[in-house]
Amino acid sequence: MFKNPAELADRVLAGTPVTPDEALDLLRTDDPGMLDLVAAAARLRREHFGMTVKVNYLVNLKSGLCAEDCGYCSQRLNAGTDILKYSWLSPEQAVEQAEYGIKGGASRVCLVASGRGPSNREVGNVTRTVEALKEQHPDVEVCACLGLLKDGQAESLSSAGVNAYNHNLNTAESHYESICSTHTYQDRVDTVERAKDAGLSPCSGLIVGMRETDEQLVEAVFALRDLGSDSVPVNFLMPFEGTPLAGTWQLSPQKCLKILAVVRFVCPDKEIRMAGGREMHLRSLQPLALHVVNSLFLGDYLTSEGQAAEADLAMIADAGFTVLGAGPDPSRDRHAGPADVQGSGAEQGAGERTTTPCGSVCGSAAGSSSGDGSAPDGGRAPADVSRSGPAEAVGSSPEDGSRNAGGPARTRSAAASSAPTGAGMSPALAALLGSDDGPEQDEDDTRVRVELSPTVRRRGAGTSVAPNA
């Protein structure tokens, strides 16, 4: 046991790793001790990464129509979610989207596709995209996230210039059957190992807030350490309407900070990324989280909106950090004053622009079998993307793309009542949601819980509207 986080940080810096019991104690730090925990984790962050922040940018190559049954995912085929659905972007379309993030300061582009895993033909489409991107931007890192890999596919990606492969474990092995029944935890581990064997940098992380216990969260973090993940994205569950986990709210900004700090203590020298859901769950504590993490995604996510890129860059600069590979001011000439930054301040704190970890941004293997939803020629995305619900012009104006898709705030009871009760849900997840076996809540926790609907992405890839990068 340890007396305080600072002493434990001293020990970690001296080369002695934390134990699971110590990590559990850190996770259960009371709120008055939270700043001491963050300060100790910040020492570990600065030791290995200084005051830099790595900026990553997502390009959603194929959206929705996924046959896997991951309980958190808005891209599952039978989810009643109102997301964009489209087939594979062409290499030219994908490079065009990547350009937005690169101009915004991203040093890594993440190419993501929904689906259980790619066919060899689809891997060929991705390699052509990577080659085209690297021809124009040879120094930009490329991370692929395509689901479960077959023999030889990781080698093909590596030969084309892919630097890293993302496939999240998402949760603890002891909790996995409660989240998904169409593939196993070991399937995910095997894909990460295939990527490593091919020389790709392994990227694997978590989705927190899926009714896991504190013990299971610690179990998952240590599994990521043992897996040897170079990059650990931490997603915060966004309970999309129409998914089995709709109405699941167990995170507060303070709890999110504690989770990030625990990941830093367990993986002190790894890239830790605050990923999907940070805007909704960390809210006004995002700048403080930068003292623990050293990486984030810029702009929108796969199926939902993120904080405006200008607000992200201003947040990084205001907190005293610099974007990795950029000058001293990461937002450069784009760094407007507070009144000029769109989507920042109280608007962001209110959760109006929110995100969800869904589909493959989480490194998910969730998705349709190879080829589901693909265009006949295997390459071109249709001009008009489809979406569930009534037909509506997508991208008629930037305002339409950023404001009209989200819907008003929901109370906890309303959100919970809208959750599915069986259809398309694994038996283990149905049992968990119908039981009292979820994480215990503090009886004295009187904080106001903010619960808002995610805002569905209507811009960027698959639309005619520019992204918010």
From Swiss-Prot:
InterPro entries: Aldolase_TIM, BATS_dom, Biotin_synth/BioAB, Elp3/MiaA/NifB-like_rSAM, rSAM. Residues 51-278 form the Radical SAM core domain. Residues 326-469 are annotated as: Disordered. It is an enzyme of class 2 (transferase). Transmembrane segments: none annotated. Catalyzes the conversion of dethiobiotin (DTB) to biotin by the insertion of a sulfur atom into dethiobiotin via a radical-based mechanism. Binds 1 [4Fe-4S] cluster. The cluster is coordinated with 3 cysteines and an exchangeable S-adenosyl-L-methionine. Belongs to the radical SAM superfamily. Biotin synthase family. Keywords: 2Fe-2S, 4Fe-4S, Biotin biosynthesis, Iron, Iron-sulfur, Metal-binding, S-adenosyl-L-methionine, Transferase. Its EC number is 2.8.1.6. Pathway: Cofactor biosynthesis; biotin biosynthesis; biotin from 7,8-diaminononanoate: step 2/2. Residues 363-384, 405-428 have a biased composition (Low complexity). Homodimer. [4Fe-4S] cluster binds at C66, C70, C73. Its cofactor is [4Fe-4S] cluster; [2Fe-2S] cluster. This is Biotin synthase. It catalyses: (4R,5S)-dethiobiotin + (sulfur carrier)-SH + 2 reduced [2Fe-2S]-[ferredoxin] + 2 S-adenosyl-L-methionine = (sulfur carrier)-H + biotin + 2 5'-deoxyadenosine + 2 L-methionine + 2 oxidized [2Fe-2S]-[ferredoxin]. [2Fe-2S] cluster binds at C110, C143, C203, R273. One of its GO terms (biological process) is biotin biosynthetic process. GO terms for molecular function: 2 iron, 2 sulfur cluster binding; 4 iron, 4 sulfur cluster binding; biotin synthase activity; iron ion binding.
